[in-house]
Amino acid sequence: MPERFLVFIPAYNCEKQVPRVLNQLLDRQVAAMVTECIVVNNRSTDGTEAAVQSWMQAHPQAPVRLLRNDQNYGLGGSHKVAFQYAVQHNFDYLIVLHGDDQGDIRDVLPLVHSGRHRKYDCCLGSRFMPESRIKGYSTPVSYTHLRAHETSLHL
C-alpha cells in the first residue's frame, strides 16, 4: 500500500504568499508524493481565503481542501486541527508548509525518496541550518541546532 502524505498549510493573513506556496504542489515530484493538502485558514482578515479558493478553481486537479477554523486558534490550534485531520483520514505522514512562503516542500524530497523518513517519528527542517539557503535576510543569522536526521527524540 502506498504511503499517504498530507501537506498542511497553516494560513493567517498571507493572501499574497499562499498562491506561491500552493504552486509548489504542482511540481511533478511533489505531486507524485502528496496524497492531499489542507489549507487551514485561521480566521484571516485579509483575502487569504479568497486567494486559496481562486487557486483551487484554477487548479482543480490538485488535491487541495480549504478548512476554516471557527475562531482564531493560533498556530498551535491550527496544528491540532491538522493532526486530528491526519489521524481521522489515515495519513501516514504530515508535512507542515507555512502559508507565508517560509519553506520549499522540495527540500523534503531527498528524505522521502531515500526512505530515511521512515526511521524517525519527527523530522524538522530549518532555513537557519548552515547548509540552508536563506533568502530575504539582510544580516547573517546563526543558530545552534539539532539535525533531525542525526537525532531522534521520543516523547
Question: What feature does the model see in each segment?
Answer:
Residues 14-28:
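Short, well-formed alpha-helical segments that are part of the catalytic scaffolds
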Residues 11, 40-42, 69:
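Conserved sequence signature across two-component system core domains
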Residues 14-17, 44, 104:
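Donor nucleotide-sugar binding loop of glycosyltransferases
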Residues 69-88, 93, 105-153:
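Acceptor/aglycone-binding surface of glycosyltransferases and processive sugar-polymer synthases
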Residues 43, 74, 102:
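A short, conserved beta-strand element in the Rossmann-like catalytic core
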Residues 41-50:
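A conserved acidic beta->alpha catalytic loop
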Residues 4-6, 36:
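Cell-envelope/extracellular polymer assembly enzymes that use nucleotide-activated donors
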